[in-house]
Regions:
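Glycine-rich beta-alpha-beta "Rossmann" dinucleotide-binding loop(s) and their flanking helix/strand
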Residues: 2-20, 191, 195-217, 307, ...
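Predominantly flavin-linked oxidoreductase catalytic cores and closely associated redox partners
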Residues: 171-176, 182-270, 335, 343
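Glycine/serine-rich phosphate-binding loop and adjoining beta1-alpha1 elements at the start
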Residues: 12-66, 171-177, 182-211
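Active-site-adjacent segment of FAD-dependent monooxygenases/related oxidoreductases
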Residues: 104-143
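Short hydrophobic core segments
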Residues: 36-38, 79-81, 104, 185-198, ...
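A Rossmann-like FAD-binding core segment of flavoenzymes
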Residues: 6-7, 120-126, 139-188, 247-338
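Rossmann-like dinucleotide/flavin-binding elements
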Residues: 27-106, 217-262, 305, 326-331, ...
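Non-ligating segments of multi-cofactor redox enzymes
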Residues: 337-731, 736-763
Length: 763
C-alpha cells in the first residue's frame, strides 16, 4: 500500500520531466561535482552560436578563480571533453586566458556537424547576437564550416585529441581529476563536459537493427536510387529524410502514433503532397519488430487487433531522435534534474517528529492514549525538534530530495498554519502559542508574514529581472517584473499595513469614510483594491461598506473582463501577488512545472474551486432572507477558508515550488484564474480576443519554450504548426518567457514578426 502510494507521488513529482532531462547545474554551469562543468547541447544551448557563448562564459568564470592555474606540469588546468562548437570555443578561450588545456573527442572534430547530410546549410542564428570567441561562424555549408574550424585549430596550435573518448573520471582528494580516456590517463584541475547528446541516436532495440543497411542518420541521400527505403520516425528529421529520399526512391514511413503532431508547417505540406503523389506511403500506429535481409517486419495496430506486415526494405533509416547519455553522466557522478532520491516515508517521519518536538516545546502537549505526553519537559521538545529537523537538513545536503520536500513543508506549514487561522486557532502543534511567538516588536504575525512575502518577492524578483530582463536586454520582462514588484509593495504591503491607517487618521479618504466604522475598521479590505472576487473571496460579505461592494462588482465583473479581452490572463503574471511570488521566488524552478496531457487534465480542479466559491458566495448573500441557507453558508465559508485560503493558496503550492514549479495554485486551484480563462476562451471563440502568441516558420524544435513554461503548455507544438497560442486551447498567462527564451525569435505577441530572407551563397 505504501509503495503504491509512493509510486503515485513519484509520478506526480516527475511530471515536470521533459523527454530529455538535463544535468542539474548550479551557477556558471557547474554540476554537483565541484570543478566539473557542463556546456553546449547537454546544458540546453539549442543552437551553435549559444553553445559557443557558453564555452566562452564558462572559461571566463574558471580563469577568474585564484587556483585556475596549476603549478604542476603534469596537471592540466583544464580538460575539455567534446570538440564541438561549445568545446572548441571553450578550449580556444582557455588558451587565450593562459590556461593549459586539452580537448578530447571520441569521434571526429565537430562530430555532430560532420554527420549532417552533405551540403547541409548551417545557420548562424540568432541574428540579434554576434558570435563570441575565436571560432568562425557564419551561414555556410557544413563542409566549409568544418574546414574553417580545422584551420583555426591548426593556427592556434590547439591540443585536440580526436578518436579518443572519455572512459572514466575520478575526483581526487586534492580536488584534481584523474581522467581516463581510450588511449591514456591525464590529470586536470577542472573538467568541461561538452559532449552533446545528438551523437547518441536512440535505437529501436529490435532484432536485425545492427545490420549493415540499417542506419541511424542520413549522410548522403544522392547515393540511393530506385530502391525500397523504410524510414522509421515521425519527427522533422525523419520526414525531411523521407522527402529527400523519395525524389529517387520508393519510401515508406513507419510511425508509432496515429498522426504527426510536431511537424514544421512546411514539412507537413510537402509530406501531404508527396503522399498524394504516391511517392511516400505512411504506416501509422506501427512498430518495427525485426529487420531482415531486404525486408522489415512491422506490427500495425488496426484499432484493437495487431497485424504483422512484411515490407520491402533495401535500406532502413531509424530516425527517432537522440538519447541523453544518462548512464555515462551518472558514471561521472553527475546528478540529473528532478532526480528523486531518498525515502519519502523517512522524510515524513522526521517532519512529524519535528512537529512533535515543537508541540512539547509549546507547552500545550496533552496526554494521549494513556501516554503522559503532558509531562514531557519543554527542553526535550527542543532536542527532538532540533534532532529531527537537523537530520532532514543533513539528508538534504547528501542529495535526499524527499528531505528537502519535508523541510519545505515544515517551513510553509508553520507560516500559514500560524498566520492564517489567527491567534488561538493555529494548526497543531502551534495551537495557543504560535501566533504570539511570531508576533514581534509589537506587530502581529500577519504583519511579519507580509514583510516576509514582500522580501522574498523583492530579492528573487531582482534576480529574475537580471535573468530575464537585463541579461537578455528584454524590456518586456523588465517592465513585467517592475509591475509585479510595484503592485506588491504598493497595494499588498504599504496600503494595507500603513497607508490605509494614515488615510483614516488624516482623512485622505474624506471625513465621511474616515468616520464610518464599517470602512475605517476593515483595513484588510484594501487588498480588494486589486484582488478581484473570487480570489478576494470575502469582498461581498461580513458587512462591507457600500464603496467596497461597488468597487468589488466593478473590478470583478467589468474591469477584469475588459482587461482579459485585451490581455488574456496577464493579471496572473503582471499584477497578482500570488502569481508574483510564483514568478519571482518560484522562477528558478519554472522548468519543473508538470507537463503532458495528464497534467492538463488536472486543471479541472480550479473550475471546481470556482463553482464552490460561487455557491458559497451566493449562499452568504441570500442567507438573511433564506433561513435554510444560514448553516450551509457558514459551513461553506469555514470550509473555503480552511481548504482554499490556507492549504491550496498557501501551504501546498509554496511547499511545492522547488518541485513542481511556482504556478501550482495559479494553474490548478485559483478560481479567479479559471474565471479569466473562461472569459478569454469565450472571447477567442467569438473572434474578438486581442490576446494570442503567434509563431513564424523558423522553429528548430529545441523545446526551450516548453521547458520554461510555468503552466506546462507544450508551446513548441504550437510553434511547429504555426498555430496561435491562446486561451481557447491553453492556460497561457502571458508571461512571455517562451518569447524571451526562443533562440530563433519564432514567437511574438500578436502578429508574427517579419522574416529576414537569408540567401545561401557559395564561394
Amino acid at each position: 500500500m505504501l509503495r503504491k502510494l509512493q509510486r503515485k507521488i513519484d509520478s506526480v513529482l516527475a511530471s515536470g520531466d521533459m523527454p530529455t532531462r538535463r544535468p542539474a547545474l548550479r551557477g556558471n554551469n557547474e554540476s554537483n561535482v565541484p570543478g566539473l562543468y557542463v556546456i553546449g547541447d547537454l546544458a540546453g544551448a539549442p543552437v551553435i552560436k549559444l553553445a559557443m557563448a557558453q564555452g566562452v562564459a564558462v572559461i571566463d568564470h574558471i580563469a577568474a578563480k585564484p587556483d585556475a592555474r596549476s603549478a604542476d606540469p603534469n596537471v592540466y588546468d583544464l580538460i575539455v571533453v567534446g570538440a564541438g562548437a561549445a568545446g572548441l570555443n571553450a578550449a580556444l578561450a582557455a588558451q587565450d586566458k593562459g590556461l593549459r588545456a586539452l580537448a578530447l573527442e571520441k569521434g571526429k572534430i565537430a562530430n555532430t556537424i560532420e554527420n549532417f547530410p552533405e551540403g547541409k546549410w548551417v545557420y548562424a542564428e540568432p541574428d540579434s547576437s554576434p558570435p563570441k570567441g575565436k571560432l568562425w561562424l557564419d551561414g555556410a555549408r557544413k563542409e566549409d564550416l568544418i574546414g574553417r574550424w580545422s584551420q583555426i585549430i591548426t593556427e592556434n596550435h590547439l591540443d585536440v585529441r580526436a578518436e579518443e573518448g572519455l572512459k572514466a573520471l575520478e575526483r581526487q582528494k586534492d580536488g584534481t581529476f584523474r581522467v581516463t580516456s581510450d588511449k591514456a590517463e591525464y590529470r586536470a584541475r577542472r573538467i568541461v563536459l561538452a559532449t552533446g547528446q545528438r551523437g547518441n541516436p536512440r535505437k529501436l532495440r529490435v532484432p536485425g537493427e545492427d545490420r549493415e543497411r540499417v542506419y541511424h542518420r542520413l549522410y548522403s541521400p544522392r547515393h540511393y536510387k530506385n530502391e525500397d527505403i523504410l524510414v522509421v520516425g515521425g519527427g522533422n528529421s525523419a520526414i525531411e529524410a523521407a522527402l529527400v529520399l523519395a525524389e529517387r526512391n520508393r519510401v515508406r514511413i513507419s510511425y508509432r502514433a496515429s498522426e504527426f503532431s510536431r511537424l514544421f508547417k512546411d514539412n507537413d505540406r510537402k509530406l501531404n503532397e508527396a503522399v498524394a503523389q504516391k511517392r511516400i506511403e505512411l504506416i501509422f500506429n506501427s512498430n518495427v519488430c525485426e529487420f531482415r535481409e531486404k525486408e522489415a517486419v512491422v506490427e500495425v495496430d488496426r484499432g484493437g487487433h495487431q497485424e504483422r506486415l512484411t515490407v520491402p526494405c533495401d535500406h532502413a533509416f531509424v530516425l527517432i531522435g537522440a538519447e541523453l547519455p544518462v548512464q555515462f553522466l551518472k558514471s561521472l557522478g553527475i546528478r540529473m534534474e528532478n532526480e528523486w532520491t531518498g525515502s519519502l516515508w523517512r522524510a515524513a517521519a522526521l517532519a512529524f517528529a519535528t512537529l512533535l518536538g515543537l508541540w512539547f516545546l509549546g507547552g500545550h502537549a496533552a496526554n494521549w492514549a494513556g501516554l503522559p505526553l503532558a509531562e514531557v519537559p519543554r527542553f526535550a521538545g527542543v532536542l527532538l525538534a532540533a534532532a529531527a529537523g537537523g537530520a532532514l537538513v543533513a539528508l538534504g545536503f547528501r542529495g535526499d530530495r524527499y528531505a528537502w520536500l519535508g523541510l519545505s513543508f515544515l517551513a510553509w506549514y508553520t507560516v500559514y498554519g500560524v498566520k492564517s487561522p489567527g491567534a488561538g486557532a493555529e494548526f497543531w502543534p502551534y495551537r495557543g502559542w504560535g501566533f504570539q511567538a511570531l508576533s514581534l516588536f509589537g506587530r502581529p504575525a500577519t504583519f511579519w508574514y507580509t514583510v516576509l512575502y514582500t522580501t522574498l518577492m523583492t530579492v528573487f524578483g531582482i534576480q529574475a529581472i537580471k535573468r530575464w530582463g537585463l541579461d537578455r536586454r528584454d524590456k518586456f520582462q523588465i517592465w513585467r517584473y517592475i509591475s509585479l514588484l510595484s503592485f506588491q509593495w504598493i497595494f499588498f504591503f504599504l496600503i494595507p499595513e500603513f497607508l490605509f491607517q494614515w488615510a483614516i487618521k488624516y482623512q485622505w479618504v474624506g471625513e465621511r469614510l474616515a468616520n464610518d466604522p464599517a470602512f475605517a475598521g476593515q483595513a484588510w479590505r484594501s487588498y480588494g483594491l486589486v484582488y478581484a472576487w473570487p480570489l478576494f473571496f470575502y469582498a461581498f460579505f461580513y458587512d462591507p461598506a457600500k464603496i467596497w461592494v461597488l468597487w468589488g462588482v466593478l473590478l470583478s465583473f467589468v474591469i477584469i473582463p475588459l482587461f482579459v479581452l485585451f490581455h488574456g490572463k496577464r493579471y496572473c503574471s503582471w499584477i497578482c501577488g500570488c502569481g508574483g511570488l510564483a514568478e519571482t521566488f518560484g522562477d528558478r524552478w519554472r522548468h519543473l512545472a508538470p507537463k503532458g496531457r495528464a497534467s492538463m487534465r488536472w486543471e479541472w480542479m480550479n473550475l471546481a474551486v470556482l463553482i464552490f466559491a460561487a455557491a458559497v458566495t451566493l449562499a452568504m448573500l441570500l442567507r438573511d432572507g433564506v433561513a435554510l441557507l444560514r448553516q450551509p453558508a457558514a459551513w461553506g465559508v469555514n470550509a473555503y477558508h480552511l481548504y482554499a485560503d490556507i492549504w491550496l493558496v498557501g501551504i501546498l503550492p509554496v511547499t511545492l515550488y522547488p518541485f513542481l514549479g511556482g504556478k501550482v495554485w495559479c494553474r490548478y486551484w485559483c478560481p479567479l484564474a479559471k474565471l479569466m480563462h473562461l472569459f478569454s476562451a469565450a472571447y477567442t471563440k467569438l473572434g474578438i480576443s486581442r490576446f494570442r502568441i503567434e509563431a513564424n516558420d523558423k522553429c528548430i524544435a529545441c523545446s526551450e519554450c516548453t521547458r520554461n513554461c510555468q503552466v506546462g503548455i507544450d508551446v513548441m507544438s504550437y510553434a511547429l504548426k504555426q498555430q496561435p497560442l491562446d486561451n481557447a486551447t491553453s492556460s497561457c498567462i502571458g508571461c512571455g518567457i517562451c518569447v524571451s527564451v526562443c533562440p530563433m525569435d519564432v514567437l511574438s505577441f500578436g502578429p508574427p514578426p517579419k522574416l529576414v530572407q537569408i540567401s545561401a551563397t557559395r564561394n
